Regions:
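Short loop/turn motifs that connect adjacent beta-strands in outer-membrane beta-barrel proteins
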Residues: 45-52, 94-104, 141-148, 185-191, ...
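Outer-membrane pore/translocation modules
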Residues: 104-105, 110-213, 262-267, 281
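Sec/Tat signal peptide C-region and signal peptidase I cleavage site
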Residues: 24-30
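Gram-negative outer-membrane beta-barrel proteins
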Residues: 63-69, 96-98, 113-119, 142, ...
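Surface-exposed strand-loop-strand hairpins of Gram-negative outer-membrane beta-barrel proteins
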Residues: 32-33, 62-85, 119-126
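Hydrophobic, lipid-facing positions within transmembrane beta-strands of outer-membrane proteins
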Residues: 39-41, 53-55, 59, 84-90, ...
Length: 322
């Protein structure tokens, strides 16, 4: 693999590597949240990093003052809410292969303030440890495309008590399967188009007969890569483009602890906005900023997603050609 090619994969995928891997007062069509918070993936979301050990930190900020009903109309509720999360991430991509793809694994150790469990602005929790996750992935690098498949396990390590407004976790186990691809339309791979689809399933919430509906999440974007020559074999690599997401319930919430009139509804939301990220080779650092205002929400909050991240290549495991 050329140094530029290795750097491009590193730059485009380090954000996946550091990510891979979240009592409704209004008695109207309440929807429970799943574990996957949209907005954590964007440009080149379907690309796995080159073999290596990666450490990262992600900050997610979500301000909102709007809740939409099933027709898309804003529900008149007072107040506003800002949910904030910080996630420490560890990712390893190995040279071991399965079905021709590199095997990788990730851990996420998240902290959150004001965790949203239902579509309510009545949330007041301190910055505290929330539900962690473990991930596994397989990645393939083709001539004009990358492919990645994965599995994420969400573990209910946060505090949870049914009906409380100070929960830091969701009280449920989550199983998520992902498949994504990054396609390069031009021969020089300056342009990239990416999308990753995730399907999430949940156990009943602890101590309840409430099962959050199966959830689908699509994240990706369209971007342009720019290179700047610096000292050393790998250039500085910048990526600028538009990132977006769609999240929707595939099945409605169910269980005997949910009133019959509130069962079966399916929420949705979309987000779209700019992303810029840069890989600086000498300190082996990647920096990212992403802003995605939401629209088209149904039965959930509609706000603004802001993501900042930093990733560090702790050790490269790329095999050098002889």
């Amino acid at each position: 693999m050329s140094n530029a090619g290795s750097g491009r994969r590193l730059f485009g995928a380090i954000f996946w590597s550091v990510l891979i891997v979240t009592a409704f007062p209004l008695a109207s069509e309440a929807q429970y949240k799943g574990d996957d918070i949209p907005g954590f993936l964007g440009l080149q979301s379907g690309t796995q990093a080159p073999p290596g050990i990666y450490v990262g930190n992600v900050v997610w900020v979500y301000p909102t003052s709007t809740i939409k009903d099933n027709s898309g109309h804003a529900i008149n509720l007072p107040g506003s809410l800002t949910s904030t999360a910080e996630i420490i991430l560890l990712n390893v991509v190995t040279n071991y292969k399965l079905f021709g793809g590199n095997i990788g694994g990730s851990d996420g150790f998240p902290f959150i303030k004001n965790r949203i469990e239902l579509n309510s602005l009545d949330v007041n929790t301190p910055f505290a440890y929330t539900d962690m996750f473990l991930g596994a992935s397989l990645g393939w690098s083709l001539k004009r495309a990358d492919i990645m498949a994965g599995y994420n396990l969400y573990i209910p390590t946060g505090r949870f008590s049914q009906g409380a407004n100070d929960n830091t976790g969701l009280g449920q186990w989550g199983n998520e399967f992902t498949i994504g691809s990054t396609v390069y339309p031009d021969q020089k791979k300056l342009w990239n188009v990416a999308a990753t689809f995730a399907l999430e399933f949940h156990t009943d919430k602890s101590g309840t007969n409430i099962n959050v509906g199966d959830m689908g999440t699509v994240q990706g974007g369209v971007g342009r890569t720019f290179y700047k020559k610096v000292s050393g074999p790998i250039p500085m690599i910048m990526n600028l483009g538009v990132a977006g997401y769609a999240q929707f319930k595939v099945t409605g919430d169910s269980g005997s602890d949910i009133p019959p009139a509130l069962r079966g509804y399916k929420d949705r939301v979309f987000g779209l906005g700019p992303e810029f990220n840069i890989y600086i080779p000498k300190p082996r650092l990647s920096l990212l900023v992403r802003y995605e205002p939401e629209f088209g929400a149904r039965l959930r909050t509609q706000g603004q997603t802001v993501v900042f991240s930093i990733g560090w290549v702790a050790k490269s495991l790329v095999k050098q050609p002889h």
